[in-house]
Amino acid sequence: MSRRTRRRWELRSLAIVAVFTLLAAACGGGEDLDEGDGGTATDGGDAAQDLSGQTVEVAATWTGAEQERFQMVLDAFAEQTGAEVRFLSAGDDLAAFVGPRIEGGDPPDVAILPQPGVLQSFAEQGDLVPIEDVAGDLVDENLGPGGREVGSYEDELYGVWFKAAQKSTVWYHVPTFEDAGVQTPTTWDEMLEVAGTISDFGVEPFSIGADVGWPLTDLFENVYLRTAGPDMYDQLARHDIPWTDDSVKEALTVMADIFGQPDLIAGGTENALQTDFNGSITQIWASDTPQGAMLLEGDFVGGIITGETDAELGTDADFFDFPSIDGSEPAVVGGGDIAGLLDDTEGGRALIAFLATPDAAEIWAAEGGFISPMTTVDLSAYGDDIGRRAAEALQQAGDAVRYDLSDLQPTEFGATTGQGMWGLMIDFLRNPNDVDGTAEALERAASQAYGE
């Protein structure tokens, strides 16, 4: 990575931090904004075109309930336009899936990019089509300056920020908590005490899906934001401090409170290493004998619970805020998914425009497991109390909201299967005693990705 490119990554990280502060302020919604000149999917925008006989391909990493909920959005678009829409499952690595098709000259029309780092990489390589004329007015109207920044590269709009994520939640199995006689904790130490009680009750408390690694990076980011604070988090995100810094080692040591006790992990460490993310959810809520009682992951877990199990939110599943560590103030790690145009087709342009409207967002919001970054989507649009509470927690964190750190990194360090943060966090789960070695390996991988 050249010095000029590294500087763009640094500026990008700073901008995204500001964006999530804007989202925290706006997430309460409730404002009725005037219609802009860009139109919407239902009042004459591109998505209202007659696209009968055309096929639109959409690639995304969503699976299970998330894929089903997004399919409802695509079905609404198809009904409006007459287009046939094909969802392409990209597995865990979107870049690896669409890369060969781009190189072969046959990319899918639209890709749902799971982090700004992927958008930046694709745009820098010339693989994304600018969408200012497609959805610029809609982005300004419905997402505001923050949404424009998330979807932009070098001041050019390339993506529509469609789905936000509040990743600072801990989901728990309500009946197990009740039967074990424990209350939801507010601090890390209390959570470990609850875990011990649940373990004594006969249930291994923490369910972890670590076959790929990104859930482990989410855990690190939540711990680091609380132990090091927002300012240090920003510095690490920009690689202004090395991964061998004592603050990183402190966060890894805290994580080892769980990783270093395999009897607290559902099925033990080996089971966690073989369990995918959805499996870490269903092994708790899809069985009469739950394997696990707590899952440290984001708001989107709720949608998977209701979509893939018979469990009911509030009765069988609920969440508490990620706990304070050593008196840390409330803080939230956020994320998001961005729709980008890979092929400049009529159908692809129309779908991008549709995804920039509240009509599209409210379809998923009503089903659960979804937070919209649009300021024009009111909290009343959410079909369950869980979604509203997650959105409110994002709002209340204020200036302590930070974007998912791994998502801000060069893709080879922050979002690639088997390497960088994903791979090294898996290695740390295997060997949680090697804090120094893990920090050194993270620094080597980061330096290589940044071209240092």
Model-derived segments and spans:
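Hinge/lid segment of periplasmic solute-binding proteins
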Residues: 47-50, 116-168, 192, 318-319
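Short, solvent-exposed loop/beta-turn-alpha elements that line the ligand-binding surface or hinge
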Residues: 132-143, 210, 227-251, 307-312, ...
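Periplasmic solute-binding protein
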Residues: 120-126, 147-186, 203, 209-236, ...
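C-terminal capping/gating helix-and-loop segments adjacent to ligand/active sites or protein-protein/ligand interfaces
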Residues: 161, 370-377, 391-446
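Extracytoplasmic/periplasmic substrate-recognition and gating elements
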Residues: 75-76, 300, 306-371
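Extracytoplasmic ligand-binding clamshell segments of periplasmic binding protein
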Residues: 230-308
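Conserved N-terminal structural module of periplasmic/extracytoplasmic solute-binding proteins
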Residues: 2-8, 27-120, 363, 437, ...
